[in-house]
Amino acid sequence: VEIINAFTSSPESPPAGAVDILRAGLIPLLILKLKTESDEIQELILGTLSNCLRVEASEALASDVITILKEKLTHPSVTIRSKAAQVILEIGTHPEGKSTVCEEVIPLLVSLLEDADPEVQASAAGALMFATIKPKGRCLALRAEAIPRLLKLVAEENSKARLSAIKTLTMLAEVAEGRRKLLECTNTFQQCLRDPSEAVRRAAEIAIRVIQWKPF
């Protein structure tokens, strides 16, 4: 596993080694190893899966990866929780992955927005951002009370999750219920217009426009 992880830990996006692992059909074996290996090896496997699933996710989904990742999202290890959320983020970038993430892990991701570790928060917010692209994902996130947790991350100037949280809230504002709740909180987004990051400032501008949109 350490050799595989080194093979995929390249600065390329996606790493060249990830494609070779996919072609070799090793994804089901790596997923199976998550059940039995030590925490240290699990961290390596999750890092490898993250790189591989950036390329293609169908084999992992067929191997019931979501069930195992759900367990890892509540693991005592901060690194394992963060890496598991990152794998879910990569799965959510694929059309076939969004539905699975919506159906199975949104409540867990919402709870991780309050994790004590900033990396876990950032990975969870990123995964939610992709999961809420689908209407069903937005409804499930609203039902899981995602808005107050996301707003808290937006209000934290140094939060690593700030950009993903703003984008996720923009998705939730596409739903009438979400827009109503967020209309009372536009000041939080106004503060982001002074953020040093251009991406954050631009995302905040879009969020404010969507929240304040009114039908003719």
Show which residues each predicted segment covers.
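Alpha-helical solenoid repeats of the armadillo/HEAT superfamily
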Residues: 1-9, 20-23, 37-51, 74-92, ...
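Buried hydrophobic core positions in alpha-solenoid tandem helical repeats
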Residues: 29-31, 68-70, 108-110, 149-151, ...
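Alpha-helical adaptor scaffolds
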Residues: 133-136, 148
